[in-house]
C-alpha cells in the first residue's frame, strides 16, 4: 500500500518529538524537574541593618537581571564575570565599600574599619593572584607560606626590624618575632608563665582572644599548648596581617573595637591579650575596655604589654594612671606587674567572680547595665555600662580542658546536659561513619574549616583530634548557641549569611553547612551566598552540605556553573570542590 509524503513527514516529526521528550526527562539537568519560577517568586529582602549600606565600586558589568535563575537552575543560564577594580583580588565586600566609607561623618572611632555592606551583594567572581599555588601544608605553613599567594611587600618592609616576617625566595618566612617579642614569641609565652604560674595553658586557659594580633604568632605558638586563640585586627591597619595569619593556618578574623560590640558572646574568653595593640582603652568613657570586660569570663585574665606599663615618660605615665582609674572602677585587680630581661614589661589583670565589689564602689561609674543582655552582638552599639556577672557558682567553671568539651555550665539556660550529650554523640557518629569514610574529601589537605551553622559546635568537637581548627558560625536568625560553643573550649562568631564574611578571599579549606542554605532562600538569593562561598574557599578546597534534595540539586547546578566538581552521597550530602577556573578577563577595546 502506498504511503503518501504527508504521512511520512508526520511519522518522522512524531518520532523526533518522542526522542526529544525522552532526552529532556533523562538528562542530568532534568533529574529533579521544578516548576519554572523566577527567584523573585521565593525571594524576600533581608530586613535593613542599622549600618548604612552603599553599592560598592568593585563589581562586574552584569545587571541583576542576568543573574536571576529559575528554580530548575540550568547551568547554561548562569553567566559569571570577574569583579573589576585594582583591589578585586583581595576584595571583602562589607569592608571595602569605599562609596559608603567616603560618606561617613566621622572616623574618630574607627567607623571606616567597621562593616558597611553593599546592596545588592556583588555576584561577580574574584580573580586569583598571579602564580597562585595550593597552600603550604600544615604544620610547615606556620613557619612559611607562598609569597605569590599573598604578595604584600609593604608589611615585609614595614616590619623588617621587628622580625615579624621575611621574604626568602618564593616564600614568606615567619621567625616568631614581634614588637613585644624581642627574644621571640616562645620566650614571651614563657615570660607570661613565670609571671603568673596559675596560668596553665591548655588546662584552665583554653580559649584566648588576641587583640591587634599582627601576623598571629602569639596564637600560633599557643597551638602547641592546646590553646585556641581568636586573633583579630582591623583590615589594612598593617597590610594584610590577618590574611597572612589565615594563610599560615592560624585562627584569625577581621574586626575592630570601634562603635559596635565584637561578634562574640558575653563571658566567652579565658584570657585576653594585647601587646602594643594600639587601642585607647580609656577612650569614650572607657567603652573599649568595658567591651573586653563583657567578653572576658568571670575570673579570666587580661594581659596588657605596652609602654605605659614599663616606661615613665609623661605620656606613658598619663596613660597608665588613666588605666589604673578605669580598671579600679570595674573591679579588675592587678595580679602581677613585671618586666622581662628584654626590657619588655606586662601587667596581668583579673576580672572578679562576684558582684560584691560592684556594689561597694563609692560611685557607680560606670553603672551596671540595667537590662538583661542579649548574647547576640550583631550590629549592637558599644555600651557605657558594666556587664552583670552570670548567676551561680562561676568559680567552678569552666572545667579544665579537655573535660569541658563535653560539659555543661551549671545553671546553663542555653543547653541541658542530656541535650548536649545527644548532640555530641550524633555528630561523633556522623563524622566518623560518613564525613571521614565516605565523602570525597581529602582531609589531609584540610586545615582551616568554617561550620556555617554550628549549633552547639558538635561538628567541631567531632573533629577535635584532627590537625585542623573550626570557626563555628552561629547565624543571627538561628537559636543563640554561641555561648555554649565557647563554654566547650571552641571558638566562633555570629554572622548573617545574607551578608559577606569578615575574612579575606581564599582563606578556608572547607566550608560545612548543615540544613542552612535551604532556609536562607526565604531572605536572600542562594546565588549570592554561593558567590560568597566561592570567595572564601581556596582553590582545591571543599564545600560539604547536608540538606534536603531540593537544596542539593540547586547547589549542584550553581556549583557546576562555577566549574566546581560535585558528588552527591545518599541523597543527603553534597561535596563540591573548587578548581582554578575563573571567567575570562574582558578584552581591552
Swiss-Prot record:
Cytoplasmic topology ranges: 1-4
Enzyme Commission (EC) number: 2.1.1.-
Keyword Ligase: no
Localization (cell): Golgi apparatus membrane
Family: Belongs to the methyltransferase superfamily.
Stored InterPro entries: Put_SAM_MeTrfase, SAM-dependent_MTases_sf
Enzyme class, spelled out: transferase
One cellular component term from this protein's GO annotations in UniProt: Golgi apparatus
Side of membrane Lumenal, spans: 26-589
Membrane topology: Single-pass type II membrane protein
SUPFAM superfamilies: S-adenosyl-L-methionine-dependent methyltransferases
CDD domains linked: AdoMet_MTases
Residues that span the membrane, as ranges: 5-25
GO molecular function ontology, one term from the record: methyltransferase activity
Glycan attachment sites: 70, 375, 442
GO biological process: methylation
Keywords: Glycoprotein, Golgi apparatus, Membrane, Methyltransferase, Signal-anchor, Transferase, Transmembrane, Transmembrane helix
Protein name: Probable methyltransferase PMT23
Highest classification ranks of the organism: Eukaryota, Viridiplantae, Streptophyta, Embryophyta, Tracheophyta
Amino acid at each position: 500500500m502506498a504511503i503518501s509524503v504527508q504521512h511520512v513527514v508526520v511519522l518522522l516529526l512524531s518520532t523526533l518529538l518522542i526522542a526529544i521528550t525522552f532526552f529532556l526527562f533523562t538528562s542530568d539537568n532534568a533529574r529533579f524537574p521544578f516548576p519554572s519560577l523566577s527567584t523573585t517568586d521565593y525571594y524576600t529582602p533581608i530586613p535593613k541593618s542599622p549600618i548604612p549600606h552603599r553599592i560598592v565600586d568593585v563589581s562586574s558589568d552584569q545587571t541583576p537581571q542576568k543573574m536571576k535563575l529559575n528554580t530548575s537552575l540550568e547551568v547554561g543560564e548562569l553567566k559569571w564575570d570577574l569583579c573589576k577594580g585594582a583591589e578585586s583580588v583581595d576584595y571583602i565586600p562589607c569592608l571595602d565599600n569605599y562609596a559608603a566609607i567616603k560618606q561617613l561623618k566621622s572616623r574618630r572611632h574607627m567607623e571606616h574599619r567597621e562593616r558597611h555592606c553593599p546592596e545588592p551583594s556583588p555576584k561577580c567572581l574574584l580573580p586569583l593572584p598571579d602564580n597562585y599555588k595550593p597552600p603550604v601544608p600544615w604544620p610547615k605553613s606556620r613557619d612559611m607560606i607562598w609569597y605569590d599567594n599573598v604578595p604584600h611587600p609593604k608589611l615585609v618592609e614595614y616590619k623588617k626590624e621587628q622580625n615579624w616576617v621575611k621574604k626568602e625566595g618564593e616564600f614568606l618566612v615567619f621567625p616568631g618575632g614581634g614588637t613585644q617579642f624581642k627574644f621571640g614569641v616562645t620566650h614571651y609565652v614563657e615570660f607570661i608563665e613565670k609571671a603568673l604560674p596559675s596560668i596553665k595553658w591548655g588546662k584552665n586557659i583554653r580559649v584566648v582572644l588576641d587583640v591587634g594580633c599582627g601576623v598571629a604568632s602569639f596564637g600560633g605558638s599557643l597551638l602547641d599548648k592546646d590553646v585556641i586563640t581568636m586573633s583579630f585586627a582591623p583590615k589594612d591597619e598593617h597590610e594584610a596581617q590577618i590574611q597572612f595569619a589565615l594563610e599560615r593556618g592560624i585562627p584569625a578574623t577581621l574586626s575592630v573595637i570601634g562603635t559596635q560590640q565584637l561578634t562574640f558572646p558575653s563571658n566567652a574568653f579565658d584570657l585576653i591579650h594585647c601587646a602594643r595593640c594600639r587601642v585607647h582603652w580609656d577612650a569614650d568613657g572607657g567603652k573599649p575596655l568595658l567591651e573586653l570586660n563583657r567578653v572576658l569570663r568571670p575570673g579570666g585574665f587580661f594581659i596588657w604589654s605596652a609602654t605605659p606599663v614599663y616606661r615613665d615618660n609623661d605620656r606613658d605615665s598619663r596613660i597608665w594612671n588613666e588605666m589604673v582609674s578605669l580598671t579600679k572602677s570595674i573591679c579588675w585587680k592587678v595580679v602581677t606587674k613585671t618586666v622581662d630581661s628584654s626590657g619588655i614589661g606586662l601587667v596581668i589583670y583579673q576580672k572578679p567572680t562576684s558582684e560584691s565589689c560592684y556594689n561597694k564602689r563609692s560611685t557607680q561609674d560606670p553603672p551596671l547595665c540595667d537590662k538583661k543582655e542579649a548574647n547576640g552582638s550583631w550590629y549592637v552599639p558599644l555600651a557605657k555600662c558594666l556587664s552583670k556577672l552570670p548567676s551561680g557558682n562561676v568559680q567552678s567553671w569552666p572545667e579544665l580542658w579537655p573535660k569541658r568539651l563535653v560539659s555543661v555550665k551549671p545553671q546553663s539556660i542555653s543547653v541541658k546536659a542530656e541535650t548536649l550529650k545527644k548532640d555530641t554523640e550524633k555528630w561523633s557518629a556522623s563524622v566518623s561513619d560518613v564525613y571521614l569514610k565516605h565523602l570525597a574529601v581529602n582531609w589531609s589537605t584540610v586545615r582551616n574549616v568554617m561550620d556555617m551553622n554550628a549549633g552547639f559546635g558538635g561538628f567541631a568537637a567531632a573533629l577535635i583530634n584532627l590537625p585542623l581548627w573550626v570557626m563555628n558560625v552561629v547565624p543571627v536568625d538561628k537559636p543563640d548557641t554561641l555561648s555554649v560553643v565557647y563554654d566547650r573550649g571552641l571558638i566562633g562568631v555570629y554572622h548573617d549569611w545574607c551578608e559577606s564574611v569578615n575574612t579575606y578571599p581564599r582563606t578556608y579549606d572547607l566550608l560545612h553547612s548543615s540544613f542552612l542554605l535551604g532556609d536562607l532562600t526565604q531572605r536572600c538569593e542562594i546565588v549570592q551566598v554561593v558567590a560568597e562561598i566561592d570567595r572564601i574557599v581556596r582553590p582545591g578546597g571543599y564545600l560539604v552540605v547536608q540538606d534536603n534534595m531540593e537544596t542539593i540539586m540547586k547547589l549542584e547546578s550553581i556549583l557546576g556553573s562555577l566549574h566546581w566538581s560535585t558528588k552527591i552521597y545518599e541523597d543527603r550530602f553534597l561535596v563540591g570542590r573548587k578548581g582554578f577556573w575563573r571567567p575570562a578577563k574582558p578584552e581591552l577595546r
